[in-house]
Amino acid sequence: ADANHLQIIPSGPGYTTEPNLRMFNSLVHHAKDRLVLCSPYFVPDESLLEAVTTACYRGVDVELYVSAKADQFMVNHAQSSYYQALLEAGVRIYQFPYPFVLHSKFIITDPDDPGRDPLCMFGSSNMDPRSFGLNYESTMLVAKGDLIDQFNQLVSNYRAVCHQLLSLIHI
């Protein structure tokens, strides 16, 4: 097995530069072919939303994995308010079936092509303002190793049970 090259990225009220948000954005911009985002609470700030949609516009295959229904009422509405913009940009949104809650938190870039220098981040940080600035969080950056392959396999397992959101119904 390949050795994993890891770096811990802490964040919280004592970190005024929002290191997790900056690293999430950096990984999104790093993606060349494929980007996978997985978060139970995907409520991006303007910079992350712009980074993700721009990745689509430059030809990156972007997948977002979320719960079909979040376990918190307000989060569910906040998260779903971004779906139209994401779908219009070309993001493929996969919803983990209700009543289960997808609680994994990770991002992978270019996992299918080792020549593209795949990267992965996982940890306690959701992709929302609370995790980026209010809560104390720890995220691990994986720059090399078989952990990236394991997360890519996890994505395949999720995709097998998820429903793809193709459009929003407006009533």
Where are these regions (language model features)?
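Charged, low-complexity intrinsically disordered terminal segments
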Residues: 1-169
